[in-house]
């Protein structure tokens, strides 16, 4: 785990290279790229550069994933507005609009708004959230685990999920490995719980859902919470069931005092926790809770 640190006795150059590629560079671009693609989905290719610049500015200002999400939507709609404002340009100059006018003005307007309007309050909110979670960590570990686990399932990859995940990474950097154990457990439960429900309550899911449930086993095991989104979108009752199961799993990891120094990996990094079996038990119990709740609240499906 610490072999990328030159001060650690286990240091080796290959691990340091991997850390430089991933942690020092690739991971720092995640928010910027996310914002760029959000903007592009709204305004097509001219929105990508303004969105990416806005997302990078959010990262630099410690506004986190929430700042990046706002930057993406902001840049996208800024470019949409520019497209409407510049309809008067002669058709002979249309080629300039997507490669020069929209990106250039989009970057300028998005950058100014991010710098003077968005970044400061969003960064303050993220800092408040981090400090609040840290205060819970010193006062009541189990309560912190319940909250962090539940946050991972509320929006399954959205701002709250990413806020919890970002907090966990920050705690790992600070040498506190307990919070991220709850976070990763909570993030695995929604797809795993749904997968179990489709297996043991087959009559309450369509054939297509049962087939998708098999995929959820793998996505849950790999800590891909987003695998549960199609089920939640089709039936909102999935969300409270997932939140309860994730909160149970997160609370149990803190009750068992599990620590996890790895930022990602799902069940495949369980062996590096201080209590691998108790960690896996926490995840299984949380998934079972979600599955049972779904089995109770969902009605049988009539196959045509």
Swiss-Prot record:
Alphabetically ordered keywords of this record? Cell membrane, Membrane, Phosphotransferase system, Sugar transport, Transmembrane, Transmembrane helix, Transport
What's the protein called, per UniProt? Answer: Fructose permease IIC component
Listed transmembrane segments: 20-40, 62-82, 98-118, 140-160, 181-201, 214-234, 238-258, 277-297
Domain PTS EIIC type-2: residue ranges: 1-304
Where in or outside the cell is it found?
Cell membrane
Q: From what organism does this protein derive?
A: Bacillus amyloliquefaciens (Bacillus velezensis)
Relay the domain remarks.
The EIIC domain forms the PTS system translocation channel and contains the specific substrate-binding site.
Q: Which Pfam families does this one have?
A: PTS_EIIC
Q: Where is it mostly found? A: membrane
Q: Does the keyword Cell membrane apply?
A: yes
The way this protein sits in the membrane is described as:
Multi-pass membrane protein
- Per the record's keyword annotation, is Membrane included, yes or no? yes
* GO terms, biological process: phosphoenolpyruvate-dependent sugar phosphotransferase system
Function comment = The phosphoenolpyruvate-dependent sugar phosphotransferase system (PTS), a major carbohydrate active -transport system, catalyzes the phosphorylation of incoming sugar substrates concomitant with their translocation across the cell membrane. This system is involved in fructose transport.
User: Which Gene Ontology terms of cellular component type are present?
Assistant: plasma membrane
Q: Which GO terms describe its molecular function?
A: carbohydrate:proton symporter activity; protein-N(PI)-phosphohistidine-sugar phosphotransferase activity; protein-phosphocysteine-sugar phosphotransferase activity
Which PANTHER family did the record assign? FRUCTOSE-LIKE PERMEASE, PTS SYSTEM 2-O-ALPHA-MANNOSYL-D-GLYCERATE-SPECIFIC EIIABC COMPONENT
Q: Which InterPro entries is this protein grouped with? A: Bacterial_PTS_Sugar_Transport, PTS_EIIC, PTS_EIIC_2, PTS_IIC_fruc
């Amino acid at each position: 785990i610490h072999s990328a640190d030159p001060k650690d006795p286990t240091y080796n150059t290959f691990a340091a290279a991997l850390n430089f590629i991933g942690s020092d560079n690739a991971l720092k671009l995640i928010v910027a790229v996310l914002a760029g693609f959000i903007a592009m989905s709204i305004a097509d290719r001219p929105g990508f550069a303004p969105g990416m610049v806005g997302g990078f500015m959010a990262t630099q200002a410690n506004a986190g994933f929430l700042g990046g999400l706002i930057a993406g939507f902001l840049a996208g709609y800024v470019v949409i507005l520019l497209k409407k404002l510049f309809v008067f340009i002669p058709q002979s100059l249309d080629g300039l609009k997507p490669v020069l006018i929209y990106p250039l003005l989009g970057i300028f307007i998005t950058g100014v708004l991010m710098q003077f309007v968005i970044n400061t309050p969003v960064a303050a909110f993220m800092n408040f959230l981090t400090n609040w979670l840290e205060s819970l960590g010193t006062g009541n570990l189990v309560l912190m685990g319940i909250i962090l686990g539940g946050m991972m399932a509320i929006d399954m990859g959205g701002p709250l999920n990413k806020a919890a995940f970002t907090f966990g990474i920050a705690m790992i950097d600070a040498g506190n490995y307990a919070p991220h154990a709850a976070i990763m457990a909570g993030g695995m439960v929604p797809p795993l719980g749904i997968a179990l429900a489709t297996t043991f309550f087959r009559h309450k899911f369509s054939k297509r859902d049962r087939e998708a449930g098999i995929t959820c086993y793998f996505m849950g095991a790999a800590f891909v919470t987003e695998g549960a989104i199609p089920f939640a979108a089709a039936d909102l009752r999935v969300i409270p069931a997932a939140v309860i199961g994730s909160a149970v799993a997160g609370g149990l990891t803190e009750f068992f005092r599990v620590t996890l120094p790895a930022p990602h990996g799902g069940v495949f990094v369980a062996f590096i926790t201080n209590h691998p079996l108790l960690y896996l038990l926490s995840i299984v119990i949380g998934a079972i809770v979600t599955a049972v709740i779904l089995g109770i609240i969902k009605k049988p499906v009539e196959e045509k």
